[in-house]
Amino acid sequence: MATSPMLFLVSLLLVLVAAATGDEASPSNAAAPAAPVLVGGRTEIRDVGSNKAVQSLGRFAVAEHNRRLRHGGSGGPADPVPVKLAFARVVEAQKQVVSGVAYYLKVAASARDPRGGAAAGGDRVFDAVVVVKAWLKSKELVSFTPASSTK
């Protein structure tokens, strides 16, 4: 009978799936995370001030924004900030695994005066999205917009 081995394999698969999901749902599982993690969801990056990789991505986002301005990219929907900026720091960051890793950064930067230095007026906060594909050794600025005043 050809159906007997197939029935056995399906039954075995169901038992394995039930065992795998039943263990995670058990309240006695001591290794369970404190907060639920959504697969494919965003996760906070802690200690962004001392995280050199995150600060480097913020610096890249501002440099890429300025490069696009030099090449006529101002005012477009993907880059609506019409002034060159001087990077200050990343103040907040999240990451999300997509086709690569998407970093959602809150970047503090100030407007640059025409001589290249930071202009008076202090830092403003911008939302930047950078996608890193390590296996291709690439990173791309997807968007760079003024941050909304509400969190």
Swiss-Prot record:
Keywords: Plant defense, Protease inhibitor, Secreted, Signal, Thiol protease inhibitor. One of its GO terms (cellular component) is extracellular region. CDD domains: CY. A motif (Secondary area of contact) lies at residues 96-100. It comes from the Eukaryota. It is found in: Secreted. SUPFAM superfamilies: Cystatin/monellin. GO terms for biological process: defense response. GO terms for molecular function: cysteine-type endopeptidase inhibitor activity. Residues 40-109 form the Cystatin domain. Residues 1-22 form the signal peptide. Gene3D superfamilies: 3.10.450.10. Belongs to the cystatin family. Phytocystatin subfamily. PANTHER family: CYSTEINE PROTEINASE INHIBITOR 10, CYSTEINE PROTEINASE INHIBITOR 2. Specific inhibitor of cysteine proteinases. Probably involved in the regulation of endogenous processes and in defense against pests and pathogens. This is Cysteine proteinase inhibitor 10. It comes from Oryza sativa subsp. indica.
